[in-house]
């Protein structure tokens, strides 16, 4: 369940499905990798990725803050952080470009599609979402 961090209310279906056309907002998403972990004695690499909605997209979706945080647990220990981030960004944007609209649920679906690979074991999500109240 996704909640608004200001009011602690659950996000409604209308708020989650609210979308805009992707060509109306230039550079709608900002991708940031803030940690790469290599646990000892395993063949696992954990990528901590944050997707931020830019100002124009937040304004169009009536959001105050939208940070989507993901931990991607992979068996791919060859890819560096920047290599995996570029691949991840490309797959997410490919999905959204094909869909044509961008919103909260569509970005989460795009991440689910981008991480549906044989080398990905788990994807953990922790989102920071605040809607404009005023």
Swiss-Prot record:
Keywords: Host-virus interaction. Belongs to the geminiviridae replication enhancer protein family. This is Replication enhancer protein. Homooligomer. Interacts with the replication-associated protein (REP). Interacts with host proliferating cell nuclear antigen (PCNA). Interacts with host retinoblastoma-related protein 1 (RBR1), and may thereby deregulate the host cell cycle. Oligomerization and interaction with PCNA are necessary for optimal replication enhancement. It comes from Squash leaf curl virus. One of its GO terms (biological process) is viral process. Increases viral DNA accumulation. Enhances infectivity and symptom expression. It comes from the Viruses.
């Amino acid at each position: 369940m996704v909640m608004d961090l200001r009011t602690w209310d659950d996000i409604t279906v209308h708020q989650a499905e609210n979308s805009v056309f992707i060509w109306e907002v230039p550079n709608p998403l900002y991708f940031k990798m803030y940690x790469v972990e290599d646990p000892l004695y395993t063949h696992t690499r954990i990528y901590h990725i944050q997707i931020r909605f830019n100002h124009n997209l937040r304004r169009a979706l009536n959001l105050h803050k939208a940070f989507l945080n993901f931990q991607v647990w992979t068996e791919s220990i060859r890819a560096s952080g920047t290599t995996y981030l570029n691949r991840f960004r490309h797959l997410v944007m490919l999905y959204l470009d094909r869909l044509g609209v961008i919103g909260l649920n569509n970005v989460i679906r795009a991440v689910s599609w981008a991480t549906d690979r044989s080398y990905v074991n788990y994807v953990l999500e922790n989102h920071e979402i605040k809607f404009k109240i005023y």
